[in-house]
Regions:
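C-terminal core of ALDH-fold dehydrogenases
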Residues: 152-258
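Short, solvent-exposed amphipathic alpha-helical segments in soluble enzyme
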Residues: 2-6, 29, 53-55, 83-88, ...
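Structural motif
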Residues: 10-13, 34-38, 43, 59, ...
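Glycine-rich, Lys/Arg-enriched anion-binding loops that position phosphate/diphosphate groups
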Residues: 117-165
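Conserved NAD(P)+-binding/catalytic subdomain of aldehyde/semialdehyde dehydrogenases
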Residues: 6-86, 90-95
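Residues at or immediately preceding the N-termini of alpha-helices
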Residues: 18, 77, 103, 143-146, ...
C-alpha cells in the first residue's frame, strides 16, 4: 500500500485467482478492463493468462516458484541444504533442485535437510516434503560442465551458484531468471533487500524472458521522417526492394512521387 501511494496508484481491487485474470481481461461491472497483467500466480492463474492472451497482454510467464542450487564438491553442505528449501516452501507445485556432480555433497546435504525440517511449521514442512519428492530433488551429474548444461536447459526462475569460483561459473550460465553468486547470497536476500525484481520467468521461459522491470510498464512507437532531398536519395533503393518483393503498390508511391 505504501508503494502504491508513492507511485500514485489510486485504485486497488482485492481479488485473485483465475477469476481475477478473467475480470481484468474482459472487464466487469466493478473492475475495468486492463491492458496488461504484471506479476506471478499459481499454475491455474498462469494457464488462465495463456488462454486469455488474445484479450490482454499476459506479461511474462511467472508461475509456481523454482530454484536450482548449483554446487560443487567445495560447497558448504549446511548452506546448500538451507537454500535448497527456500522456494520449496511456497507450495506443493514448486520446484527445488540441487544440481551437483558431487555424490559426497549430496550425502551430507540430505540429512541436514531432514534435521532442518523439524524446525519448520507443519504446513511449510508438508510443502517442502511434497516438493522434494515430486517436482524437486537431486540431479547428480558427471561434471560441473554437465551440471551447467542442465541448468541452461531447465532455465530456472532462481539460481544459486555455490561453486569454488562462482564468478568463473557465471559467464557459462545463459538461462536463469536471476543468478545469485557465492555462499552469502540466498534467494531471501534478493527477494527482500538486495534490489533485483523478484517477479521472474518460470517454466523454462527464462530462455526468452527477463525479470519484470520498468520497461514492462513502457512502450514505444517508431517515428520516421524524410525530407524531399532525403527521399530523392533513397527512392530508387526503396523501389527496387518493392519490385524484388513483388509489391506493386509499395513501389508506385516512390516511383510516381514528384
Amino acid at each position: 500500500m505504501a508503494a502504491a501511494k508513492i507511485i500514485g496508484i489510486t485504485e486497488i481491487y482485492k481479488v485473485g485467482g483465475i477469476q481475477a485474470v478473467a475480470a481484468v481481461a474482459y472487464g466487469t461491472e466493478t473492475i475495468p478492463k486492463c491492458h496488461k497483467i504484471i506479476g506471478p500466480g499459481n499454475s491455474y492463474a498462469t494457464a488462465a493468462k495463456r488462454v486469455l492472451a488474445n484479450h490482454i497482454d499476459a506479461g511474462l510467464p511467472a508461475g509456481p516458484s523454482e530454484i536450482i542450487v548449483l554446487a560443487d564438491e567445495k560447497a558448504d553442505p549446511e548452506k546448500v541444504a538451507l537454500d535448497w528449501m527456500i522456494e520449496a516452501e511456497h507450495g506443493p507445485d514448486s520446484a527445488a533442485l540441487l544440481v551437483t556432480h558431487s555424490k559426497e555433497l549430496v550425502e551430507k546435504v540430505v540429512p541436514i535437510v531432514n534435521r532442518q525440517l523439524e524446525k519448520i511449521s507443519p504446513k511449510r514442512k508438508e510443502f517442502i516434503e511434497t516438493n522434494l519428492t515430486t517436482y524437486g530433488g537431486v540431479i547428480l551429474t558427471n561434471s560441473l560442465d554437465e551440471s551447467i548444461d542442465f541448468v541452461n536447459e531447465y532455465a530456472p526462475e532462481h539460481m544459486e551458484v555455490m561453486t569454488e569460483k562462482p564468478f568463473d561459473t557465471l559467464p557459462k550460465i545463459k538461462n536463469a531468471g536471476e543468478i545469485l553468486l557465492g555462499d552469502y547470497t540466498p534467494v531471501t536476500l534478493c527477494n527482500f533487500v538486495l534490489g533485483p525484481n523478484a517477479i521472474l520467468p518460470t517454466g523454462g521461459f527464462a530462455k526468452t524472458y527477463s525479470s519484470v522491470s520498468v520497461q514492462d510498464f513502457l512502450k514505444r512507437s517508431s517515428v520516421g521522417y524524410a525530407s524531399k532531398d532525403g527521399f530523392e536519395n533513397v527512392r530508387d533503393y526503396a523501389y527496387r526492394f518493392a519490385k524484388v518483393e513483388g509489391f506493386d503498390t509499395h513501389g508506385l508511391p516512390v516511383k510516381e512521387r514528384n
